[in-house]
Structure formats: structure tokens, C-alpha cells
From Swiss-Prot:
This protein's encoding gene: pyrD
Top class in the EC scheme: oxidoreductase
Organism of this sequence: Streptomyces coelicolor (strain ATCC BAA-471 / A3(2) / M145)
Entry function: Catalyzes the conversion of dihydroorotate to orotate with quinone as electron acceptor.
Identification of the protein by name: Dihydroorotate dehydrogenase (quinone)
Keywords: Cell membrane, Flavoprotein, FMN, Membrane, Oxidoreductase, Pyrimidine biosynthesis
Length: 368
């Protein structure tokens, strides 16, 4: 039903306008008690065998919404209603910013992919922190907060910008993510180099600890799929050394070659980060490499090209304790979360593993 609707309606609309329209519907639905209860019962079924513990947090399952969909923390309950076990908001920057000029979001329907050059459009850390502080949760879900650099802040002043966001947002976050991997903010990916990343992560960790003294807010870093293998290893080693809680692998890619893209050259040639199905192989490769390097010492989150329960299961076997998606949600619609949960539960029952935790990294351990 949704695929027909997408073909007849959403596919004919500007992608960003369609996003805002869908967003509005989700937010409206969650405001009606009877409707949200019915929708959650239908689309967010709970499977006991999928219960997950990660980052010191308990979740209904391992499957969550990647950052980028809810940039301003306005639809957390709506996304939980649709079956996401954790919702990562953002990317949020120190100061509010409009992002890059439109048109900045493109669908590659033939490739089940998106290209975006949104540029961290968001309300800024002060406004988002206030929104989170005033929120009365309807559904119990884990909320991650993804922070990035304000565009106008020079690279040499980036640490202070991230620290400002961390101090404001850490009190309202179940976990924090340092995003240094978006291709749409000039110079941002330079911060993935360990000599720049070390002081940044250390400063954000200290800022979060200053802002929240009653608990330790887990801190993760999100990396790009375009890192060379030796740089992936370097980030993994640094994460362990600094006592980071996790790594999210991966963000969007700037690559176009070797991905088997069949969409029109004009679309494929659009500047920005590519997400969705074509990213699957490289994101999985990075995840496997990370798990081989860090094992169970830190939590790994697999994202990039996750479309089906089988994809999610593959990420778990490759070392992911948590799995995220976003692009496939655009193509699969509101029933996607339900299908992911049902498929994952079935896959676990068919496997030799008693729990999801037993399955994490099993393929990598088998070949090491």
C-alpha cells in the first residue's frame, strides 16, 4: 500500500517537501491518544528475544533511527510509535543555521538511495536542549543526540563549538554522538584525523561530565565509509584508548564509482553524501574491520544500506550491537520497523544463538 502511495504521491513531490509532509503526519498522529496507541500496537510490536542492553541502556530491540530524520527533536515519540527502539536526533550544531541552499535532497529511486547536501540545517543546541528539557515522553525510547560543527566556526575553533553543544545537550541525552563525518560541512571530515580527533573527543567527554554529574553519558563517534583502512584502525585504537563508549559506522559516502549506480548521470553527479543500498558493502566492510580491531571493548553501531532484517542480522554478526536505518524508511514507509522486528526475531530463532548478544560479531570471530 505504501509503495503505491510513494509512487503516486511522494515520488512526484520535491523530496524535502515530501519529508516535511510525512513528518507532519507522524507528529499529528502521536498527539491523538487512541490513534497513537493503535498505531504503536500495530507497528511497534515487542519481541522479548530482541531485548538489548547497550551503552549501559536497556532497549526493546537493537533497531533505531539514524540521525538526520529528526534534526530538532520534534518527533521522538512519533518515531518510537513506528517501531524504532532508539531515536538519534540531529545533527545539532552549537548555533542555529539554515543549512545549504535548496535544492539539497535527491532521490535515486532506481538505486534505492538518497543524495543529500543539507548542511546541518537545525535550530541550534540552545533551542534543541530547551525542547528536550520540556519534553514529556509518551513512549519509552532511548534518545541519542548527534552533534556537529557550526558551519561558520573555523576549523581551529571547532572544539569550543562542540563543547558548547555537549554542555547544553548532554543533560537531556541518553547518549551523545560526535559527528565528524558529514561531507556537507567544509573541513569537517578533517577532524577524523587522530591528531584533531583526540583533543576534540577528550574535550567533549570532559564537557559532558561537567554538565552531568549524576550519571556518565555514553559518548560515541560517527565515522565516514571513505576512510582508508589504516585510518579506520587509527580511529578504533583511539576510541579504545580514550575510553569511548562506541563507534557508529558509517555516515554517507562521497564516492560514486564502483557502487553500481543506475540512476541518471545528472542525479548521480549531484554533490553531497550518498546513503542507502549502494553503501551496504562498504559500511559492512568498515564494521567488520572495526570489530576485528576492538572486539567487545566498545559498542559498535551498524548503519548504511540497511534495508531488510537480513541486512540487520548481517550487521549483528559483523559486530554491531545496535543497527540503524534512515534511507530505507523513505522507500519502505511506516511498516518498515514492524518488518525489521519480525524478521530479526525470526532470524534469531532460526540461528544457533540463544540471544542477540551471543550473535554479535560471531562471523568475525569465526574467521579470526
Amino acid at each position: 500500500m505504501y509503495k503505491t502511495f510513494f509512487k503516486l504521491v511522494f515520488s512526484r513531490m520535491d523530496p524535502e517537501r515530501a519529508h516535511h509532509l510525512a513528518f507532519r503526519w507522524i507528529r499529528l498522529a502521536v498527539r491523538v491518544p487512541v490513534l497513537r496507541t493503535f498505531v504503536a500496537a500495530a507497528l511497534a510490536p515487542r519481541h522479548k528475544e530482541l531485548r538489548t542492553e547497550a551503552l549501559g541502556l536497556r532497549m526493546h530491540g537493537p533497531f533505531g533511527l539514524a540521525a538526520g530524520f529528526d534534526k530538532n527533536a520534534v518527533a521522538i515519540d512519533g518515531m518510537a510509535m513506528l517501531g524504532f527502539d532508539h531515536v538519534e536526533i540531529g545533527t545539532v550544531t552549537g548555533e542555529p543555521q539554515p543549512g545549504n541552499p535548496k535544492k539539497r535532497l535527491f532521490r535515486l529511486v532506481a538505486d534505492r538511495a538518497l543524495i543529500n547536501r543539507m548542511g546541518f540545517n537545525n535550530d541550534g543546541s540552545l533551542a534543541v536542549a530547551a525542547r528536550l528539557a520540556s519534553r514529556t515522553p509518551v513512549f519509552r525510547t532511548v534518545v541519542g543526540v548527534n552533534i556537529g560543527k557550526t558551519k561558520v566556526v573555523p576549523e581551529e575553533e571547532a572544539v569550543g563549538d562542540y563543547v558548547k553543544s555537549a554542555e547544553r545537550l548532554a543533560p537531556h541525552a541518553d547518549y551523545l554522538v560526535v559527528n565528524v563525518s558529514s561531507p556537507n560541512t567544509p573541513g569537517l571530515r578533517n577532524l577524523q584525523a587522530t591528531e584533531a580527533l583526540r583533543p576534540l573527543l577528550s574535550a567533549v567527554r570532559e564537557a559532558a561530565d561537567r554538565a552531568v554529574t549524576a550519571r556518565r553519558v555514553p559518548l560515541l563517534v560517527k565515522i565516514a565509509p571513505d576512510l582508508a583502512d589504516e585510518d579506520v584502525d587509527a580511529v578504533a585504537d583511539l576510541a579504545v584508548e580514550l575510553g569511548l563508549d562506541g563507534i557508529i559506522a558509517t555516515n554517507t559516502t562521497i564516492a560514486r564509482e564502483g557502487l553500481g549506480l543506475t540512476s541518471s548521470p545528472a542525479l548521480v553527479g549531484e554533490t553531497g553524501g550518498l546513503s542507502g543500498a549502494p553503501l551496504k558493502a562498504r559500511s559492512l566492510e568498515v564494521l567488520r574491520r572495526l570489530y576485528a580491531r576492538v572486539g567487545d571493548r566498545i559498542t559498535l553501531v551498524g548503519v548504511g544500506g540497511v534495508e531488510t532484517a537480513e541486512d540487520a542480522w548481517e550487521r549483528i554478526l559483523a559486530g554491531a550491537t545496535l543497527v540503524q536505518g534512515y534511507s530505507a524508511f523513505i522507500y519502505e514507509g511506516p511498516f518498515w520497523g514492524r518488518a525489521m522486528h519480525k524478521g530479526l526475531a525470526a532470524r534469531l530463532r532460526q540461528s544457533p544463538y540463544a540471544t542477540l548478544a551471543d550473535a554479535v560479531g560471531a562471523d568475525v570471530r569465526k574467521h579470526s
